[in-house]
Regions:
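Accessory cap/linker subdomain of secreted extracellular hydrolases
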Residues: 32-48, 234-335, 353-354, 362-369
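Catalytic histidine neighborhood in serine/cysteine hydrolases
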Residues: 365, 369-396
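Primarily recognizes the serine-hydrolase "nucleophile elbow" in alpha/beta-hydrolase
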Residues: 182-254
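Alpha/beta-hydrolase active-site loop
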Residues: 140-143, 167-189
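Short beta-strand/loop motif that positions the catalytic acidic residue
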Residues: 342-350
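Catalytic active-site module of serine/aspartate enzymes centered on a nucleophile-bearing elbow/loop
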Residues: 382, 389-392, 396, 401-437
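Catalytic-loop region of hydrolases
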Residues: 27-103
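Short beta-strand element of the alpha/beta-hydrolase
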Residues: 92-95, 103-116, 120-128, 146
């Protein structure tokens, strides 16, 4: 077992032990983001005149897990970023400092899979001591963050969904991630100005942010791109239109459908409720601030026909939906130049999702293996180094072997070792052609 894997396993065990005893001792929660002035910009200069990645506010506090402060310093930055529509926004990132850093600082940008429509579930709130149901995911992720801190690396964790919790809006996730790194490198409070190596890592919702950051970096943030050593992603949402059909009628993941509709509506400032049935509108209202924890397994067998009016038999029959969802297909924003590790499950039946739909095929229950393979092959064709691993597991269980591979893979990238690639052995996948408008 390598040192990297040992650190990961140790981190998981320590976090599990800590979480089991810490909850009774958690202190009073801080104000939620919508009530906390730190999350708002009050400067006189219009945001549109401020460059993305500019630091607007800074505060320093202890890194909290389930409300308990740890002896780890967290620098939180409010910074300027960009919405899905290109509008100026503000967002928060958390920079966790290692207890002992040796030599030139190295940075791991960890993208959380908090998957929520509620801004109170974002990582920055959990890190500052906040407790919510959806925010339990960032608490558990401390098991993944701890090993990197123990290795002497700084960990940067952006609120990837932005201030409005724009669920599944991939390009916005990517910009929030890249701008958070610009801010972290520029802030005098973080001590990262001399950083030369940055690694990206994220699973599921975190993979959305990680992949889009990697593909947008060459054009949107070349200063960050020049420092990237690699990006590790797993459980990847490549083509959201395909995923909507894949999870339809499934036992565990069908509740993602209304969450995705809400996320697209919010990110693109469109109203999809006129196309919904009365039941669809009820779910829309019920889930407007829901996390994945409130949707997973709660709507078994849910279909599009239940959500939409009869005159809209498929999502593709709604022009405004088609126009927006086409913009969320991975690979349409550019090509990564940093090496990639991609892990994907392909036995979704374990989580109640059939793998026999035409043009879709097998997946992990929520993400589609054929889509991921096609994306990997496209990047290979553009000259990127890609290692693709496919597992006969579901989405939740794939995370285990993926982490065991991703941690040492990223460790090797920081060490300067040549990235492996298996482009020649990746099997063909699904077409990723945008829907005709």
């Amino acid at each position: 077992m390598t040192k990297a894997i040992r650190r990961a396993v140790l981190g998981v065990l320590l976090a599990a032990t800590f979480l089991s005893i810490a909850v009774p001792f958690a202190g009073a929660a801080p104000p939620k983001p919508e009530e906390d002035p730190f999350y708002s910009y009050s400067g006189s200069t219009p945001l549109a005149q401020i460059a993305p990645g500019t630091v607007l506010k800074t505060r320093t506090l202890n890194y909290h897990v389930v409300g308990v402060p740890l002896p780890v310093t967290a620098v939180q930055l409010l910074y300027r970023s960009t919405s899905e529509l290109g509008e100026p926004t503000v967002n928060v990132t958390s920079v966790l400092k290692p207890l002992l850093s040796i030599g030139t600082p190295q940075v791991v940008a960890y993208q959380s899979f908090y998957d929520s429509l509620n801004p109170a579930d974002e990582p920055s709130y959990a890190i500052s001591g906040g407790l919510t149901l959806g925010g339990a995911i960032p608490q558990v992720e401390s098991a993944l963050i701890g090993p990197e801190l123990l290795a002497g690396r700084t960990v940067v964790i952006a609120d990837t969904e932005g201030e409005g919790a724009d669920f599944a809006a991939g390009p916005e996730y990517g910009k929030n991630t890249l701008d958070s790194l610009k801010a972290a490198l520029a802030s005098s409070a973080t001590g990262l100005s001399s950083t030369k190596k940055i690694g990206l890592i994220g699973y599921s919702g975190g993979a959305i942010a990680t992949e889009w950051a990697a593909e947008l970096a060459p054009t949107y943030a070349p200063s960050v791109n020049s420092k990237l050593v690699g990006a590790a992603i797993g459980g990847v949402l490549v083509d959201p239109a395909h995923n909507l059909h894949y999870v339809e009628g499934s036992l565990s993941w069908a509740g993602v459908m209304p969450m995705a509709i809400i996320g697209v509506s919010r990110a693109f400032h469109i109203d999809l409720t006129p196309y919904l049935s009365e039941y669809g509108k009820q779910l829309y209202a019920k889930l407007e601030k829901a996390s994945i924890a409130e949707a997973l397994g709660q709507y078994p067998g849910l279909t599009w026909a239940q959500l939409a009016k009869p005159e809209y038999p498929t999502p593709e029959s709604i022009p405004v939906y088609v126009h927006t969802v086409n913009q969320l297909i991975m690979g349409t924003g550019g090509t990564p130049t940093t090496p990639l590790l991609i892990g994907q499950g392909a036995l979704g039946e374990l989580e109640g999702t059939a793998g026999d739909k035409p043009g879709i095929g097998e997946g992990d229950g929520v993400m589609i293996a054929g889509d991921v393979r096609t994306l990997a092959r496209e990047y290979c064709e553009h000259g990127d180094k890609v290692q693709y691993d496919q597992y006969a597991l579901g989405h939740i269980t794939t995370a285990v072997p993926w982490i065991a591979t991703a941690v040492p893979w990223l460790e090797a990238r920081f060490a300067g070792l040549t990235a492996p690639q298996d482009c020649g052995s990746i099997e063909p996948g699904n077409a990723l052609t945008p829907i005709a408008e």
